[in-house]
């Protein structure tokens, strides 16, 4: 299956392990520069990191939770590291470690990396948050990058850690534009009900609600009258319940459902194929996991987080001495790491008008003409108002 990013240049091998965000489920807004970190201190740290290599290759170790071959975050991270090796091989030395699924061994793997000759250690997801907060202070001479979450810079001296996560609300906004445009189109499985749906994992997870808010706002940007059904599985792994919720939404008129429910998303994809309706995946190009199977034909796109691109960009800055260690940055469309999957199914199944609508809105987002609200820091009353008002 041929694929590309609408908003990225790195062709990533991503699909349906469906790890939705994997960020903290706190509803508290995280600021981009926590604690007492200053721009001057970050610059000094970055320059020190550059000087540490003394003209030698920067030794970079990637630690992934789980294994490669997931066609999702891990494979994307691997692709980013391979791109580094191919394009910056004269400046970096790459090492990649699969930590497996036993969480009790994650800290040991991190300590092993710290005790090695690695200059820069990269890891990600909320499972590694507390470990990074602890170990980074024990090894101040090492540098760290953590993706899809952040560390709490108020806990101590974490000026050697760069945190980055992604504006999933922007990708979800484009998914909403696509869904609302598709339901009004003459696409094969579209109907005339002007109803679309969202199935999320937990209603207590800010990362899930961030996608819900973005999706609803994107849909309403296209048509303020579109109805958006919203359901929550209550779990990241209960695919049976996810399937039931999606079938109910399809039965109630939805012809496109955006799913952000982790591994439970499999149930929504099954429901789409059985109901002969459309779905939109999240985090990775989920159609890749179903290549050659009937289910792939109903996954018209996915809202993607470009982990591989962000790793490449961050390490490139680390090599140049410009990576702002001690800071947390949230990356979006303007950084080229958030967008919709553009593959052969998207090109063949989605109407030209819908594709044009997505492109037009993407340009508006890039130009700053359109902004998307975030569930992070949003009070519960406002959040519920957005969700209930859409239904």
Model-derived features: where do they sit?
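Positively charged n-region of N-terminal signal peptides that target proteins for export
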Residues: 1-10
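A residue-level marker of the well-folded mature domains of exported/periplasmic proteins
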Residues: 24-391
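C-terminal motif of bacterial Sec signal peptides marking the signal peptidase cleavage site
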Residues: 17-21
